[in-house]
Amino acid sequence: VSFLGPRLPGAQTATSPADGAMVLYELSFPAPEHRWMQVEVTAGGLPAEPLSMRMSTASPGRYARHEFAKNVFEVRAFDGNGNELDPVRSTMARWDVAGHDGTVRFTYKVFGDRVDGTYLGIDVTHAHLNIPASLMWGVGLERRPATVRFEPPAGRDWQVATQLYPSDDPLTFTAPNLQYLLDSPAELSAFMERSFPVADPANPDHAPTFRVALHHDGTDAELDRFARRVPQA
């Protein structure tokens, strides 16, 4: 189940990472039966020093340290011309990329088999992503907007449920900065969705819309009953 609140102001327009204005994330699922996701992160306009890529060790609403990087494997890096670089793992959750030309394309796979809101879970029916457990980020790039492109497995009619800002492409979304990105989980599946308004007790004229996306084997009627109970929570 994904509960999606109203988006905050600050939607961004997807642009190219080459000018250094944004960071591009491309997420694909070539073999969901093996429970891993392919991630490509591209950033341009970088200073000459090495770029440090980090995996989070904390997650919103969680009060313990999590070594999310333990699920990362097959790490590679390239410059803007496609030349392969040598990412050095300097700590458990950090890779340093030197020798780039101002642009870095950083790629890796991340394993996930836990749909618990803390990690990520991938199988042939869906992918449920807690972003701190899924996406690495560049140190010093935290204020840059991000564009996230999802590529479902071939032959799957997956949609995307997320509080990331939508674009004209139903599989491309944006975030105004890293903090918003990390706080925006995503569910990819052939889910069902319902929405409802919730009035602000301090301002009854303000009633933002909340959405419920449910990946399940039930009926529309069962989802309707479930959705009617959510506002009571």
What residue ranges belong to the model's regions?
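Non-catalytic architectural context of zinc metalloproteases
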Residues: P30, T42, P60, R65-E74, ...
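Bacterial N-terminal signal peptides
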Residues: V1-F3
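Early extracytoplasmic/domain-onset interaction patches
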Residues: A14-A58
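Intrinsically disordered/low-complexity terminal segments and short unstructured peptides
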Residues: Q12-A14, F106
